């Protein structure tokens, strides 16, 4: 540092008074960056020089100044030569010398930042320099201001989110808020809030966080006339206030009709408010400053009380409350097995309401036990009551049974039904469906064990063949036989159901078929001509021939007759069973009918023969000379020596056999054709049932 003598200082001040003012000039800089150098740089700067550089950058920027070279005269507190950096109202730095000391400072690596868009840099040199000083080389640039981080003025900072960009910034708000017109304050759209429930909770926006600024909120509680709303402030109550002026900034106000409560602010919650009306408006206002947490209130409505209710016998009331008031509703229901009875109308539940005048909308109904009513009748069956006095109410029990021994219950169900809580008779398996009574097949009351074996076609005992049917013309003349299947079907030979065909032209036309009105079915028949009280004369509904029936060869010689009404099953009328398995050679079968005995005359009563089943090859050999063919749908029976056979008038009749294990009779065949009735080596040929069983069941639906 240069030594300053008293005399030099005195001379300096004297010269300053004697010499004219130092020449000075100003340079205006408006670029975003630039360079500033002392006069004459890099040579020595002149004495008595003063230059000012005024740097201005756009809004949103500040100025950064740094020095690459600095070499000025040293002086105490930079009294001689110096560089001064300042703004309009603030000196940012003063530099001089070659290195920093206790009394002078050089910029070194220091960066000078302006707080705003303006910076002034002034260089000044005094009247003399004893040494050579090279001055300075400085650079400046505009740098972006991060307003989001550096904004100190609360009134200009963003409420929620601040987004900086080069040269400026903008504000945005959280979800549910909108930006105020000042572009920094976030407010909520909180007007028009409507509450119509009888109880509820209302809070300031974002409670318990600070509520938004510059907001005008309104909340309306609007209930049905007859209610009275009460308000209760809860938990935190924190609204900006003023120590001297009541609620000048933020406040909450309550309006109900002509009454007004408030404004309220501060940290003390208002007392509970009973508005005595059904419609209340709550107003809340906030200004553009403050960080207060807001308020929370609950409301509830009360009305006139209604009298206490007594539930009906065998019933209940829901909900069960100590007190019921206006608009409360209760649901009356009954215990399981009971129904609500109101004004002679039965229903599951009944609802009543407490009215605004304190009266119930209706009287409590009664509970009536469920009645399933008289059980439905069962076809071919009967019903008995298991409960005393033939009760039909809830949990009463009945039992269905079939008319034995002629009918049996399908699937062997118990037949027990209980009156359910829904008012229906219900079975564990069948639910609401009635059981089905199926005809018992192949179990005649009169056992064949009671008579000796029949030879050469002897009269059959009455009732031993209860399935045999007589096909009779309306004049009473019989023409064929048949077998009862199920409750209303008769199986016979197809050739029985049409007129005789011309041997020269054996084509079956529909006009040759018998009409249902051309004949009738007689069940329970024993005598051929005479009638007795056990006979049942039945009308024919329709006839169906086997689709593969050939009238020339008698292949598939089967026909079904559907009855218009079901016969009454008894000791003399019962269906025969369909076969469960194919028949085997040698099995003894019984053929019955009212046909001629050995081509001489018709018998007076039902006749039967017992013969064995014959091997189909043996049967075919017997008919080969006659050019007759025995097909797979046919079965033969008879004795080689002859003497026992079905004859004219027996066509369509049954050939049956007994299953000893099941003690049931099964249909093996239907009398179809033969040659020379009862002659040696002339077996009877029958339509075989087993291979045609599927077709029979498909048409009739009959199951054993």
UniProtKB/Swiss-Prot annotation:
<feature type="region of interest" description="Interaction with MBL2">
    <location>
        <begin position="25"/>
        <end position="189"/>
    </location>
</feature>
<dbReference type="InterPro" id="IPR043504">
    <property type="entry name" value="Peptidase_S1_PA_chymotrypsin"/>
</dbReference>
<dbReference type="InterPro" id="IPR009003">
    <property type="entry name" value="Peptidase_S1_PA"/>
</dbReference>
<dbReference type="InterPro" id="IPR035976">
    <property type="entry name" value="Sushi/SCR/CCP_sf"/>
</dbReference>
<dbReference type="Pfam" id="PF00089">
    <property type="entry name" value="Trypsin"/>
</dbReference>
<dbReference type="InterPro" id="IPR049883">
    <property type="entry name" value="NOTCH1_EGF-like"/>
</dbReference>
<feature type="disulfide bond">
    <location>
        <begin position="372"/>
        <end position="419"/>
    </location>
</feature>
<feature type="disulfide bond">
    <location>
        <begin position="148"/>
        <end position="162"/>
    </location>
</feature>
<keyword id="KW-0106">Calcium</keyword>
<feature type="active site" description="Charge relay system">
    <location>
        <position position="557"/>
    </location>
</feature>
<feature type="glycosylation site" description="N-linked (GlcNAc...) asparagine">
    <location>
        <position position="390"/>
    </location>
</feature>
<feature type="domain" description="Peptidase S1">
    <location>
        <begin position="454"/>
        <end position="701"/>
    </location>
</feature>
<keyword id="KW-0479">Metal-binding</keyword>
<feature type="region of interest" description="Homodimerization">
    <location>
        <begin position="25"/>
        <end position="189"/>
    </location>
</feature>
<feature type="binding site">
    <location>
        <position position="73"/>
    </location>
    <ligand>
        <name>Ca(2+) 1</name>
    </ligand>
</feature>
<feature type="binding site">
    <location>
        <position position="289"/>
    </location>
    <ligand>
        <name>Ca(2+) 3</name>
    </ligand>
</feature>
<keyword id="KW-0964">Secreted</keyword>
<feature type="glycosylation site" description="N-linked (GlcNAc...) asparagine">
    <location>
        <position position="183"/>
    </location>
</feature>
<keyword id="KW-0379">Hydroxylation</keyword>
<dbReference type="InterPro" id="IPR001254">
    <property type="entry name" value="Trypsin_dom"/>
</dbReference>
<feature type="binding site">
    <location>
        <position position="145"/>
    </location>
    <ligand>
        <name>Ca(2+) 2</name>
    </ligand>
</feature>
<feature type="site" description="Cleavage; by autolysis">
    <location>
        <begin position="453"/>
        <end position="454"/>
    </location>
</feature>
<comment type="function">
    <text>Functions in the lectin pathway of complement, which performs a key role in innate immunity by recognizing pathogens through patterns of sugar moieties and neutralizing them. The lectin pathway is triggered upon binding of mannan-binding lectin (MBL) and ficolins to sugar moieties which leads to activation of the associated proteases MASP1 and MASP2. Functions as an endopeptidase and may activate MASP2 or C2 or directly activate C3 the key component of complement reaction. Isoform 2 may have an inhibitory effect on the activation of the lectin pathway of complement or may cleave IGFBP5.</text>
</comment>
<feature type="region of interest" description="Interaction with FCN2">
    <location>
        <begin position="25"/>
        <end position="283"/>
    </location>
</feature>
<feature type="disulfide bond">
    <location>
        <begin position="306"/>
        <end position="354"/>
    </location>
</feature>
<feature type="disulfide bond">
    <location>
        <begin position="173"/>
        <end position="186"/>
    </location>
</feature>
<dbReference type="GO" id="GO:0005654">
    <property type="term" value="C:nucleoplasm"/>
</dbReference>
<dbReference type="InterPro" id="IPR000859">
    <property type="entry name" value="CUB_dom"/>
</dbReference>
<feature type="signal peptide">
    <location>
        <begin position="1"/>
        <end position="24"/>
    </location>
</feature>
<feature type="binding site">
    <location>
        <position position="250"/>
    </location>
    <ligand>
        <name>Ca(2+) 3</name>
    </ligand>
</feature>
<keyword id="KW-0768">Sushi</keyword>
<feature type="domain" description="CUB 2">
    <location>
        <begin position="190"/>
        <end position="302"/>
    </location>
</feature>
<keyword id="KW-0399">Innate immunity</keyword>
<feature type="domain" description="Sushi 2">
    <location>
        <begin position="370"/>
        <end position="439"/>
    </location>
</feature>
<feature type="domain" description="Sushi 1">
    <location>
        <begin position="304"/>
        <end position="369"/>
    </location>
</feature>
<feature type="binding site">
    <location>
        <position position="126"/>
    </location>
    <ligand>
        <name>Ca(2+) 1</name>
    </ligand>
</feature>
<feature type="domain" description="EGF-like; calcium-binding">
    <location>
        <begin position="144"/>
        <end position="187"/>
    </location>
</feature>
<feature type="disulfide bond">
    <location>
        <begin position="190"/>
        <end position="217"/>
    </location>
</feature>
<comment type="subunit">
    <text>Homodimer. Interacts with the oligomeric lectins MBL2, FCN2 and FCN3; triggers the lectin pathway of complement through activation of C3. Interacts with SERPING1. Interacts with COLEC11; probably triggers the lectin pathway of complement.</text>
</comment>
<dbReference type="GO" id="GO:0048306">
    <property type="term" value="F:calcium-dependent protein binding"/>
</dbReference>
<keyword id="KW-0068">Autocatalytic cleavage</keyword>
<dbReference type="InterPro" id="IPR018097">
    <property type="entry name" value="EGF_Ca-bd_CS"/>
</dbReference>
């Amino acid at each position: 540092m240069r030594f300053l003598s008293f005399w030099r200082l005195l001379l300096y001040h004297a010269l300053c008074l004697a010499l004219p003012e130092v020449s000075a000039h100003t340079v205006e800089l408006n670029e975003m960056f630039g360079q500033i150098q002392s006069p004459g740089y890099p040579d020595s700067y002149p004495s008595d020089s003063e230059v000012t550089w005024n740097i201005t950058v756009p809004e949103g920027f500040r100025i950064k100044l740094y020095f690459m070279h600095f070499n000025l005269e040293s002086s105490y507190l930079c009294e001689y030569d110096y560089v001064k950096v300042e703004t309009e109202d603030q000196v940012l730095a003063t530099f001089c010398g070659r290195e920093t000391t206790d009394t002078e400072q050089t910029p070194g690596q220091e960066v000078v930042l302006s707080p705003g868009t303006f910076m002034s840099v002034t260089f000044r040199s005094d009247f003399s320099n004893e040494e050579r000083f090279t001055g300075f080389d400085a650079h400046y640039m505009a740098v972006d201001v991060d307003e989001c981080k550096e904004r100190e003025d609360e009134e200009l900072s963003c409420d929620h989110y601040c987004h900086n960009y080069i040269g400026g910034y903008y504000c945005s708000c959280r979800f549910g808020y909108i930006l105020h017109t000042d572009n920094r304050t976030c407010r909520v759209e909180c007007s028009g809030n409507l509450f119509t429930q009888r109880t509820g909770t209302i809070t300031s926006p974002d409670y318990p966080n600070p509520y938004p600024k510059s907001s005008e909120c309104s909340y309306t509680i609007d209930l049905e006339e007859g209610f009275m709303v009460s308000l209760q402030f809860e938990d935190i109550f924190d609204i900006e206030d003023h120590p001297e002026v009541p609620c000048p900034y933020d406040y909450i106000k309550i309006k109900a009709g002509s009454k007004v409560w408030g404004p309220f602010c501060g940290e003390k919650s208002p007392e509970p408010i009973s508005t005595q009306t059904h419609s209340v408006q709550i107003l809340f206002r906030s200004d553009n400053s403050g960080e207060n947490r807001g308020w929370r209130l609950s409301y509830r409505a009360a009305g006139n009380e209604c009298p206490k209710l007594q539930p009906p016998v065998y019933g209940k009331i829901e909900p069960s409350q100590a007190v019921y008031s206006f608009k409360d509703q209760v649901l009356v229901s009954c215990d399981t097995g009971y129904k609500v009875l109101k004004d002679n109308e039965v229903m599951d539940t009944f609802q009543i309401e407490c009215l605004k005048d304190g009266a119930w909308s209706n009287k409590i109904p009664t509970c009536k036990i469920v009645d399933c009513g008289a059980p439905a009748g069962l076809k071919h069956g009967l019903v008995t009551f298991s409960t005393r006095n033939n009760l039909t109410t809830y949990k009463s029990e009945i039992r269905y049974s079939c008319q034995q021994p002629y009918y049996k219950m399908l699937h062997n169900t118990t037949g027990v039904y209980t009156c359910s809580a829904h008012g229906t008779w219900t079975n564990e398996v069948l639910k609401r469906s009635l059981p089905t009574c199926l005809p018992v097949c192949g179990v005649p009351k009169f056992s064949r064990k009671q008579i000796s074996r029949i030879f050469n076609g002897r009269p059959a005992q009455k009732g031993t063949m209860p399935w045999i049917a007589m096909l009779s013309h309306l004049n009473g003349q019989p023409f064929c036989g048949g077998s009862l299947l199920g409750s209303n079907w008769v199986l016979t030979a197809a050739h029985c159901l049409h007129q005789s065909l011309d041997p020269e032209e054996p084509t079956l036309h529909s006009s040759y078929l018998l009409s249902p009105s051309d004949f009738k079915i007689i069940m329970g028949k024993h005598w051929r001509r005479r009638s007795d009280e056990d006979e049942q004369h039945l009308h024919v509904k329709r006839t169906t021939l086997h689709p593969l029936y050939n009238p020339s060869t008698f292949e598939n010689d089967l026909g079904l007759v559907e009855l218009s009404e079901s016969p009454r099953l008894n000791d003399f009328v019962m269906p025969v069973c369909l076969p469960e398995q194919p028949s085997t050679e040698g099995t003894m079968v019984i053929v019955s009918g009212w046909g001629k005995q050995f081509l001489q005359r018709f018998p007076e009563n039902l006749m039967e023969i017992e013969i064995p089943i014959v091997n189909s090859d043996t049967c075919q050999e017997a008919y080969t000379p006659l050019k007759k063919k025995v097909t797979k749908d046919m079965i033969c029976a008879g004795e080689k020596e002859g003497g026992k056979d079905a004859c004219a008038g027996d066509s369509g009749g049954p050939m049956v056999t007994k299953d000893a294990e099941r003690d049931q009779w099964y249909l093996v065949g239907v009398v179809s054709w033969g040659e020379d009735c009862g002659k040696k080596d002339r077996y009877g040929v029958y339509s075989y049932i087993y291979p045609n069983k599927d077709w029979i069941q498909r048409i009739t639906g009959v199951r054993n």
